[in-house]
Amino acid sequence: MIILGIDLGKARTGVAICDKGELLASPLTVVTEYHREQLVEKLSALAKENKAELLAVGLPRNMDGSEGESAQNAREIGALLEEAAGLPVEFVDERGTTITAHGYLNETNTRGKKRKAVVDAVAATVILEDCLRRRRNQRQG
């Protein structure tokens, strides 16, 4: 199943994609959009263009596991995406994903403007990898 991983941000939203066999997650793009409706349109178009069957949306929980304003916003955008794209949305706890993304970028010595341009897509890839890991574990039961 092709799944898009989505790391929502105030201005930049990272998007990642996996192969049909759900083995490999890769950064796809970063969508720069400040307006919710246009963001949902752009993400829906990406889902259709890439033949996605599921959207894995990062859920920014607080470190104690509670949900604040950002998590509520993610849930609202997820509901809009589900309706606009006609695809199921699965929320993935994204605590620590940006830190992990920065770690990957440090390992590859990615710096400056290039780093800023890709960090959100790499964070989306981490979210998608978490989703894929959870799906594999559920199948193995």
What are these regions (language model features)?
Residues M1-L4, K10-G141:
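Phosphate- and other anionic-substrate recognition elements at nucleic-acid/protein interfaces
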